[in-house]
């Protein structure tokens, strides 16, 4: 069995959330302009022997999906000795497309980057593929 570490990241375009924001449901969203805890997490994973693939799931509010994924990719690039796959909206769409091709239907509510459960499930699907 190959170990897989799944790290969800929640990125917001603002420092504080207003009442009606979709992202307000996420407890610890990181502003787009700040690194957050991901660098520290990846730094600590450098010390783990036998570490397999690391999957970083990038959840963001609509309109900043690409910027959020680019931010996380820049952070992951600082750790070239780790095997890090950054999964943003584009990659999540490819997973959805493949599931539809396999006749599983459209499962965007259950598997994707919108909501804690769907994000967890996307990570589990990706880990199972590896």
Walk through the language-model features, giving the residues of each.
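Active-site-proximal specificity loops/subdomain of glycosyltransferases
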Residues: 68-130
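N-proximal low-complexity "stem/linker" segments adjacent to membrane-targeting elements
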Residues: 1-67
């Amino acid at each position: 069995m190959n170990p897989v570490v799944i790290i969800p990241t929640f990125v917001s375009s603002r420092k504080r959330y207003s009442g009606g924001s979709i992202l307000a449901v996420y407890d610890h969203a990181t502003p787009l302009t700040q690194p957050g805890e991901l660098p520290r997490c990846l730094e600590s994973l450098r010390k783990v022997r036998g570490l397999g693939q690391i999957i970083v799931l990038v959840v963001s509010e609509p309109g900043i999906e690409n910027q959020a994924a680019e931010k996380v990719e820049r952070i992951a690039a600082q750790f070239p000795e780790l095997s890090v796959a950054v999964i943003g909206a584009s990659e999540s769409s490819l997973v959805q497309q493949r599931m539809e091709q396999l006749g599983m239907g459209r499962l965007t509510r259950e598997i994707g980057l919108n909501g804690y459960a769907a994000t967890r499930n996307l990570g589990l699907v990706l880990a199972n593929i590896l």
